[in-house]
């Protein structure tokens, strides 16, 4: 879980106080967004295989591992109540912080993927607001100015707070689908296809259940005095299914 300073905890409490009265109709107007890395050897979850006693090392009963350095893809996605935009695979620049800069974020995400979707949702839901986390590329002067110039309203999001972004458990679901593949992808092109297929397989009602927990998440932040919520709360499928 992310480390939070005392100041960050206070800011989380202040954020929760500001939005504790939001109802489901107001949360419905938010576009929740995030980047995510998917590794070729991402087996962070438990993987169990049932096999005969003499098949312990059969290639169909084991999961290969790979060097993680180059075998990964970076994706960007956004969801909102009742909507899921097609997943975007991003060019991975590498380096500190993934190599993301304000200009990179503008060209790879805001211009290429968000702009059209936001305008579409604006017609459908006039009070639509865009959420992004506090990554330096997101909060750079260039990115902020681009958002202002294009009339995109931004919802405040406390730093280091994945627990109050309902897209986080959606990533968890996506990776579970990929980990469950009988024949895991062994090349970057196959991994990209697997990621797209997994995203397409995620159903809207399954995403909506996470968005619908926002009021509970806000109250939990207040109750915890700003402390980061336990990851079992982030992955609310443990609690709500």
Where would I find each of the regions flagged by the language model?
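RNase H-like two-metal-ion nuclease catalytic core shared by retroviral integrases
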Residues: 2-6, 132-134, 140-141, 156-178
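Extended, low-complexity cationic-aromatic segments
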Residues: 8-115, 225
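C-terminal anion-handling pockets and recognition modules
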Residues: 26-37, 167-241
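Structural signal for hydrophobic/aromatic residues that build the beta-strand cores
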Residues: 16, 33-34, 77, 130-133, ...
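RNase H-like DDE/DDD metal-dependent nuclease/strand-transfer catalytic core used by mobile genetic elements
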Residues: 107-157
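Conserved, non-catalytic sequence blocks in retroelement Pol enzymes and Pol-derived host proteins
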Residues: 65-69, 99-100, 104, 122, ...
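Residues that form ligand- and interface-recognition hot spots within folded domains
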Residues: 35-37, 42, 79, 83, ...
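Short interface patches used for recognition in eukaryotic signaling and trafficking proteins
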Residues: 1, 94-97, 176-181
